[in-house]
């Protein structure tokens, strides 16, 4: 008699994906972040569902409904802060996951990588529309500034902005549709994540050495289920520490004031996880140029498979490329800091230099470093 998990139509899919999946024996803790992203997504969908039961997407009552959730709903404050900080946790895992993909050359699985980039875009869109929902000052002005960027598109820009707004300014229609988008997008992300996994399991996982590991693969369960469980426990411990002790650490105090179209906050800025892209946007004086740079700052990831010049896949044995990788990480941290600063000297020039460096490292220095390393190894 066949084991049920190997014969049942549904169980068979789960079995091939999470139990009998052949996995490289040497993948490190950096490979944990894929499963942690799945955990974050489930957490966000569940907390979001409970928040949606009490939230009203109307300009007059949105802010009060969030206050009502925190004050009157049983554990509403916990659900609200878990959802708000869960977004930050999601992006921390996402950026580490992408960083690991760049470091170990996982981008050479083109289909998996491209779906990953699409997932990143959708996650950013979801986080942006979600930030508008509490209808605080930063919600309103963030929505106004970011949607206004579309007006830089020639010919159709202004019409496109008004179409998204559902009027001539950010108002009730905008809030209602943003709530609809924020509700549906996580389910689209879940479906795409499954496709992401499907393509990954076609090729099998990469490993730190960047070499084929078919001869020594081990089953996913119990080795990596245990490892993922440990990662999840550590992550949830850090997460709950943040939620219960420092719930407002990553938020903006301005969002505790109800939206007021007549009063502009002194510094309009997005959440911390968008600051690097916001800094790149601001570093170009031209509006259309800034928008193009903003989009390309993420889209540049799609070029990585075509810019790979090294004969080795991973950066594990390539000190020159490793130095450039960590320079890129440092550059992104600097851009994140600059994005939160006012537009005045010396921040303007630092932002411009950091933006140029960001694109230069990816498009110029890393491909050249790969060629130099090939020469040094006489390949």
Swiss-Prot record:
Binding site for heme b b566: 97, 196
Cofactor(s) needed: heme b
Entry's cofactor comment: Binds 2 heme b groups non-covalently.
One GO BP annotation of this record: mitochondrial electron transport, ubiquinol to cytochrome c
Protein name: Cytochrome b
Note: Heme 1 (or BL or b562) is low-potential and absorbs at about 562 nm, and heme 2 (or BH or b566) is high-potential and absorbs at about 566 nm.
Described function: Component of the ubiquinol-cytochrome c reductase complex (complex III or cytochrome b-c1 complex) that is part of the mitochondrial respiratory chain. The b-c1 complex mediates electron transfer from ubiquinol to cytochrome c. Contributes to the generation of a proton gradient across the mitochondrial membrane that is then used for ATP synthesis.
UniProt keyword list: Electron transport, Heme, Iron, Membrane, Metal-binding, Mitochondrion, Mitochondrion inner membrane, Respiratory chain, Transmembrane, Transmembrane helix, Transport, Ubiquinone
GO CC aspect terms: mitochondrial inner membrane; respiratory chain complex III
Entry's family note: Belongs to the cytochrome b family.
Membrane-topology annotation of the record: Multi-pass membrane protein
UniProt GO molecular function: metal ion binding; ubiquinol-cytochrome-c reductase activity
Residues that bind heme b b562: 83, 182
Subunit structure: The cytochrome bc1 complex contains 11 subunits: 3 respiratory subunits (MT-CYB, CYC1 and UQCRFS1), 2 core proteins (UQCRC1 and UQCRC2) and 6 low-molecular weight proteins (UQCRH/QCR6, UQCRB/QCR7, UQCRQ/QCR8, UQCR10/QCR9, UQCR11/QCR10 and a cleavage product of UQCRFS1). This cytochrome bc1 complex then forms a dimer.
Upper lineage: Eukaryota, Metazoa, Chordata, Craniata, Vertebrata
Compartments where found: Mitochondrion inner membrane
InterPro entries linked to this entry: Cyt_b/b6_C (IPR005798), Cyt_b/b6_C_sf (IPR036150), Cyt_b/b6_N (IPR005797), Cytb/b6-like_sf (IPR027387), Cytochrome_b (IPR030689), Cytochrome_b_C_euk/bac (IPR048260), Cytochrome_b_N_euk/bac (IPR048259), Di-haem_cyt_TM (IPR016174)
TM annotation in the entry: 33-53, 77-98, 113-133, 178-198, 226-246, 288-308, 320-340, 347-367
Annotated SUPFAM superfamilies: a domain/subunit of cytochrome bc1 complex (Ubiquinol-cytochrome c reductase), Transmembrane di-heme cytochromes
Binding positions for a ubiquinone per the UniProt entry: 201
């Amino acid at each position: 008699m066949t084991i049920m998990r190997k014969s049942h139509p549904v169980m068979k899919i789960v079995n091939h994906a999470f139990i009998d999946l052949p996995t490289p024996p040497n993948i490190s803790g950096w490979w944990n972040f894929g499963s942690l992203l799945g955990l974050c997504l489930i957490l966000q969908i569940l907390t979001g569902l409970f928040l949606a039961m009490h939230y009203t997407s109307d300009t007059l009552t949105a802010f009060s409904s969030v206050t009502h959730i925190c004050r009157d709903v049983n554990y509403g404050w916990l659900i609200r802060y878990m959802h708000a900080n869960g977004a930050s946790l999601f992006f921390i895992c996402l950026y580490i996951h992408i960083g690991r993909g760049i470091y170990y050359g996982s981008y050479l699985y083109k289909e998996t990588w491209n779906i990953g980039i699409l997932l990143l875009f959708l996650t950013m869109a979801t986080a942006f529309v979600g930030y508008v929902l509490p209808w605080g000052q930063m919600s309103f002005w963030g929505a106004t500034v970011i949607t206004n960027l579309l007006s830089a598109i020639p010919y159709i820009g202004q019409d496109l902005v008004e179409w998204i707004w559902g009027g001539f300014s950010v108002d009730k229609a905008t809030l209602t549709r943003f709530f609809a988008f924020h509700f549906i997008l996580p389910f689209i992300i879940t479906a795409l994540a499954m496709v992401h996994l499907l393509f990954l399991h076609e090729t099998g996982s990469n490993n730190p050495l960047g070499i084929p590991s078919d001869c020594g693969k081990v089953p996913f369960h119990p080795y990596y289920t245990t490892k993922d469980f440990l990662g999840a426990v550590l992550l949830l411990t850090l997460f709950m520490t943040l939620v219960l002790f420092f719930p407002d650490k990553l938020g903006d105090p301005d969002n505790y004031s109800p939206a007021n179209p007549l009063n502009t906050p002194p510094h309009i800025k997005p959440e911390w996880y968008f600051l690097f892209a916001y800094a790149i946007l601001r570093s170009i004086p031209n509006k259309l140029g800034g928008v193009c740079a903003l989009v390309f700052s993420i889209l540049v990831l799609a070029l990585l498979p075509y810019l790979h010049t090294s004969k080795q896949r991973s950066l594990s044995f390539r000190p020159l490329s490793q130095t450039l990788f960590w320079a890129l990480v440092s550059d992104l941290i600097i851009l994140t800091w600059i994005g939160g600063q006012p537009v005045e000297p010396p921040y303007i020039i630092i932002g411009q230099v950091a933006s140029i460096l960001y694109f230069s490292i990816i498009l110029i220095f890393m491909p050249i470093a790969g060629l130099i390393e090939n020469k040094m190894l006489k390949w």
